[in-house]
Amino acid sequence: MKSIKRIGLCISLLILIIFVTSCDGDNKIIGDSKEEQIKKSFAKTLDIYPIKNLEDLYDKEGYRDGEFKKDDKGTWLIRSEMKIQLKGENLESRGAVLEINRNTRTAKGHYIVREVVEDSDGMTHNHTKRYPVKMENNKMIPLKPIDDEKVKKEIEEFNFFVQYGNFKELENYKEDEVSYNPEVPIYSAKYQLKNSDYNVEQLRKRYNIPTQKAPKLLLKGSGNLKGSSVGYKNIEFTFIENKEENIYFTDSIYFNPSEDK
């Protein structure tokens, strides 16, 4: 009788071990699956890069959901901005935002120059200048006369990152960290890049980046992983980030319902 009980106990323990092991395995599979979903979600967005001629977006449709009206073709919103703060200096940023309306086939936005100044009381103040622009023949054109020749030239030569960025090597990047918060939901993926990376070389070619430190690439998103017109996906190349110095480049492209509908 005792031997039968021992055999029964052993069988019960064996079943318990198998069950626990299976549960752990399931959790791991779920975790790996979510990580892959995050990577695929970003890859799908980044697959649009590059679009050398922004006017191609007039004929390109993005992700649509219930937020769009039937007769609304949607509006693309693109933004690129370089921010630099050297030790003991103010944070300066230069960039542009453009709304490409597929209904009206027009594109308008602003070239933005911003300086963040800290006063003697430690309070920060934003000094921002916005220069209205439109896009014609894949070029940004000021809508008002500009006296500042430096800014005028910057606008003439400006390209959004989506026009030259390329993420065909994304699957070969080695990630430092992938995170997901289902309650918000927000998710991100971080990669350490090399200075030989194509996108890093392109940024250095276009901007005077005062460091030789290779950046980290941070991809940040919110909303449904499968797609959402109310969510976002942002790209950030962080060269330096601390209390005294900050050098980073941000970029984003969204497809939203049009305000004129």
Swiss-Prot record:
N-palmitoyl cysteine lipid modification positions: 23
Coiled coil (residue ranges): none
InterPro entries from the UniProt entry: Csa, Csa_sf
Predominant localisation class: membrane
Signal sequence segment: 1-22
Gene3D superfamilies associated with the record: 2.50.20.40
Subcellular location: Cell membrane
Lipid-carrying residues in chain (S-diacylglycerol cysteine): 23
PROSITE patterns on file: PROKAR_LIPOPROTEIN
Xref: Pfam families: DUF576 (PF04507)
Keyword vocabulary terms for this entry: Cell membrane, Lipoprotein, Membrane, Palmitate, Signal
One GO location term (cellular component): plasma membrane
UniProt membrane topology term: Lipid-anchor
NCBIfam families (UniProt xref): SA_tandem_lipo
Protein family according to the UniProt entry: Belongs to the staphylococcal tandem lipoprotein family.
Protein name: Uncharacterized lipoprotein SAOUHSC_00404
Organism, scientific name: Staphylococcus aureus (strain NCTC 8325 / PS 47)
Taxonomic lineage of the native organism: Bacteria, Bacillati, Bacillota, Bacilli, Bacillales
